[in-house]
């Protein structure tokens, strides 16, 4: 009996070891399958549910870029670029017109921060509505990162809106056109990027054009104030940092545009509300806007709506093509805004605006050229000299004959 019992025990141990080895091999094959699957263009993120929930894997394409419910990932890169550029130009040209129209209301120039508060409130509502239309509603970017982005967004838009109380609108826009300069500095210090001679030349041209435009504005514009220059310069610095931070966060965490807009602007709304409450600037602004609801809140709604649509396309540009390309596109849009500003709103004009603006445009061209050197071949100085010498020789030969 003892021998029989020992034989049964040995047999049971062997069966258990065999089952254990089989289960380990199955687990190894699962791990191998997961690794192979992760190497493809799609990935599986498995969320461990609570006891009352059932587990379901969420499958999402890494390259999906959705703007206002439209999936841009279905198009090629060139089509994506033209769609984003068209969206930026259409919505932001209307946005710029409405912004100048609001500040043309008598007595509104001191309400720049309150306009930013209303704008952030509308952006938060629009972002929440758009997020409900997306299947994946999880927040991917950490809260601390959003607090930093919200602070920079408040600085960018709040200081920019407030500067209009001290500056001519084209001057404010020409400052924004030179955002490439702080963006390049931000790219160097935040992402460790390197820029070539063409990019540096573009920054120099923009700087000289900006100085020339500001000097012209100081002699012709009746409401020129150095306070506005300081405010818009600080707004540019914040804007330069935010583009690089947004690009890094969205690519690292694969976040959607609607998520970025919702959390950054809702947190920014709290920042501005606390600031206006502490400085006693909320009451007078509310009283003034209550007397002119259509020309303030009505314009602000349309202003915020077009701005929200525009920022969605800008974020798509940042996510697909990077911060520098997005800045180049928005800079071209701002140049068009300056032209429309002189057409629709009466203001002093001097040809120094034209020459300084052309210098800024030259900087934009150099920036675009630096990104497409392999496609755009400009003749070198040596080639130009050779061509001129050959032309002279041919003319001399013709005269001799």
UniProtKB/Swiss-Prot annotation:
Write out the transmembrane intervals.
78-98, 114-134, 147-167, 170-190, 196-216, 223-243, 267-287, 298-317, 324-346, 349-369
Give me the reactions it catalyses.
3'-phosphoadenylyl sulfate(in) + adenosine 3',5'-bisphosphate(out) = 3'-phosphoadenylyl sulfate(out) + adenosine 3',5'-bisphosphate(in)
Name where it's found.
Answer: Golgi apparatus membrane
Tissue specificity, please? Preferentially and highly expressed in colon.
Sample GO molecular function, one term: 3'-phosphoadenosine 5'-phosphosulfate transmembrane transporter activity
Where does the UniProt entry place glycosylation sites? Answer: 12, 71, 254
Q: Name one GO biological process term.
A: 5'-adenylyl sulfate transmembrane transport
Report keywords, A-Z: Antiport, Glycoprotein, Golgi apparatus, Membrane, Transmembrane, Transmembrane helix, Transport
Q: Which Pfam families match?
A: UAA (PF08449)
InterPro entries, per this entry?
SCL35B1-4/HUT1
Membrane topology, from the record: Multi-pass membrane protein
Just give the chief location class: Golgi
Give the record's GO CC terms: endoplasmic reticulum membrane; Golgi membrane
Summarizing the function annotation, the protein's role is: Probably functions as a 3'-phosphoadenylyl sulfate:adenosine 3',5'-bisphosphate antiporter at the Golgi membranes. Mediates the transport from the cytosol into the lumen of the Golgi of 3'-phosphoadenylyl sulfate/adenosine 3'-phospho 5'-phosphosulfate (PAPS), a universal sulfuryl donor for sulfation events that take place in that compartment.
**Family the entry assigns:** Belongs to the nucleotide-sugar transporter family. SLC35B subfamily.
Q: What is this protein called?
A: Adenosine 3'-phospho 5'-phosphosulfate transporter 2
Give the encoding gene's name.
SLC35B3
